Amino acid sequence: MDLEEIRKKKLEELKKEEAKRKLLEQLESNVMQYLTSEAKQRLYNIKMAHPEKYELALQILYRVIQQTPTIIDDTTLKKLLAKLFQKREPKIRFIRK
């Protein structure tokens, strides 16, 4: 690989990251209009602790708000997040011969 190819790849990566960041900002601005201050605070805490989960939660919230544009309070957000990120218990089976 020569220097020019490396630059092109890096430039493409930067463009993709910028597009993703803009989409995330747009989602965030749309969703935040429908959240109470407590729900916003909870979502920001998730953003700091788990950025991947934050992005997923934003996408889900956006879809929910599109279907039923109502104000989402903290308890509703908690319920939604609990369903979204519930831990799955591994099922262990014992097979006896």
Curated annotation (Swiss-Prot):
<keyword id="KW-0238">DNA-binding</keyword>
<dbReference type="InterPro" id="IPR036883">
    <property type="entry name" value="PDCD5-like_sf"/>
</dbReference>
<comment type="similarity">
    <text>Belongs to the PDCD5 family.</text>
</comment>
<dbReference type="GO" id="GO:0003677">
    <property type="term" value="F:DNA binding"/>
</dbReference>
<dbReference type="InterPro" id="IPR002836">
    <property type="entry name" value="PDCD5-like"/>
</dbReference>
<dbReference type="Pfam" id="PF01984">
    <property type="entry name" value="dsDNA_bind"/>
</dbReference>
<protein>
    <recommendedName>
        <fullName>DNA-binding protein NEQ150</fullName>
    </recommendedName>
</protein>
